[in-house]
Amino acid sequence: MGLAAARNKQRFGLDPRNTTWSNNTSRFGHKHLEKLGWKPGSGLGLVPDSTTSHIKVSIKDDNLGLGAKLKKKEKQDEFDSGECTGLDVFQRLLGRLNGNEQTISDELDKQRTDNIINGKWGIHFVKGEVLASTWDAENKQLISYSMGKKRPVEGSSDSEVSDRKKTKKVKKEKKVKKVKKEKKEKKEKKDKKEKKVKKEKKEKKEKKLKDKHSKDTNEITRDQMLKPRDSAAVVPDAVSTRLSVRAKWIRQKRAAVMDAKALNEIFMVTD
């Protein structure tokens, strides 16, 4: 392996300097600006010696975020090392070799003090206490918002203090009333629920007793089954038909059923 650095692949567009667009004088924007008094080589806006170069298109070939390269270009001086650790020691060494040790040391100490005041470990904190501006343009001084609402002004009158106390008292009374009302509603709701549960239990119990009573009344005992019915005691008159023999046999059978003693003998029941 050699000592050559790693190769970085570069990508260029078809027209990296955007000369095709800048040299094209037939486009609408070029003609319109010339009608308004603009000439090629002059700047735009109120200042004539402003930027005269055209827009150049560049391809993003890295994984850096948007604005990273601009931040790198915004270095205040040669000592602005950003977040690179250990570079201040190297700069002190270079300053000692070049004879500017005191100047570089003062500059680095100043940067370290600013970093301690403005941020911590590369994090810069922004005070977000209020959204209003803290600078009074008319009086040309900073506006202090600390404890402005909690402590009363020294020159406040007794009427303002009494009004404030009265307002606090009214708020407190409203709060107490609200709490009492909520407690009362909660208690009423609980009582209503308990009454409903008791009523449901009572109805359930009554229904159960009613079902039990109806079951007892509908139950047929053996004595009731053996007891002859009233309809069996009524024997219809004999009908003179061709089925008189069968009718006679049916009457005899009914007569046997009517006799309780005969039924006991049939079912082998002893008193």
Curated annotation (Swiss-Prot):
Its main location: nucleus. Belongs to the PINX1 family. The gene is PXR1. This is Protein PXR1. Residues 1-26, 149-233 are annotated as: Disordered. PROSITE patterns: G_PATCH (PS50174). GO terms for cellular component: nucleolus. Keywords: Nucleus, Ribosome biogenesis, rRNA processing. Pfam families: G-patch (PF01585). GO terms for biological process: rRNA processing. Residues 25-71 form the G-patch domain. GO terms for molecular function: nucleic acid binding. Involved in rRNA-processing at A0, A1 and A2 sites and negatively regulates telomerase. Residues 165-205 have a biased composition (Basic residues). It is found in: Nucleus, Nucleolus. Residues 17-26 have a biased composition (Polar residues). Residues 206-230 have a biased composition (Basic and acidic residues).
